[in-house]
Each structure stands twice: as structure tokens, then as C-alpha cells.
Amino acid sequence: MWNPEENDSIEDAAASARSLNELLDLMYLSFEKMSPPQTERLLGFALNISSDISVWMDKEEKRREKQHY
């Protein structure tokens, strides 16, 4: 799994964003068929992915701010 602390590549961040989108789309299409524990695990996974993307965005914003000063 991608770690934003170790890999600052935009390609990896974009791949994580696509994975999150696909996971949420699949969950939306299958929501009524999933058991509550399965839903809970997948939501946890989605939250982890979104957190990774958020960390990367924060670091990228700080990096870009340093370039302008």
C-alpha cells in the first residue's frame, strides 16, 4: 500500500484516488448485499486511503509554498 510519508509521487497519489473511487463505487453498487461487518471493514479501508491522500496533499501544499518564497 502507498505510504505518503515515504513516496511523494503524484502518480501514486492519483492511483490511490482512483482506488478510493473504485472502492466507493463498488460499495455503492453492492451496499444492500454486504453484511454490516464487511461494510464496516471496507469503510475503514476507504478512510485509510482518503487519509493517505490528505497527508500527501498537505505535504505537497507545503512543498509548493516553500518554492514560492
Residue ranges and their predicted role:
Residues 1-69:
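Sequence/structural signature of long amphipathic alpha-helices
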